[in-house]
Amino acid sequence: MFNSIKRDLKRRKLYKKYESKRLLYKALISDCNLNQDLRFILTQKLNKLPRNSSQVRVKNRCILTGRGHSVYKFCRISRIKFRDLANQGLIQGCVKSSW
C-alpha cells in the first residue's frame, strides 16, 4: 500500500475520533452570548487538537492507485483507472459513446 493512502487513512481515523469535540468547540466559540475569556480558552483547546484531525486535511484518493487528483466521488476511482476499467468492460452499464 502506498504511503499516501496510509497517511490519508490515518487522517480519516483522527478526523472520526475528534469530530464531535471539534464541532462542539467551534459551536461554543462562535456563540456570542458566552464570556470572552471562556471563548478564548475554548479556542486554545481547539488549537491543541491534532492538526490532522481537521476535515480539510482529508483528501479524496483513488482506492486503486492512490492518485489525489481528478477522483470521482461516486466510485472513489481516478479518471484514468475509470477509463481503463470501462474499456476492459469491468464496469457494468458503462459503454464508450459513439454517434
Curated annotation (Swiss-Prot):
SUPFAM superfamilies: Glucocorticoid receptor-like (DNA-binding domain). Belongs to the universal ribosomal protein uS14 family. This is Small ribosomal subunit protein uS14m. Pfam families: Ribosomal_S14. GO terms for molecular function: structural constituent of ribosome. Coiled coil: none annotated. It comes from Prototheca wickerhamii. Keywords: Mitochondrion, Ribonucleoprotein, Ribosomal protein. Gene3D superfamilies: 1.10.287.1480. Its main location: mitochondrion. One of its GO terms (cellular component) is small ribosomal subunit. It comes from the Eukaryota. NCBIfam families: PRK08881.1 (NF006477). One of its GO terms (biological process) is translation. It is found in: Mitochondrion.
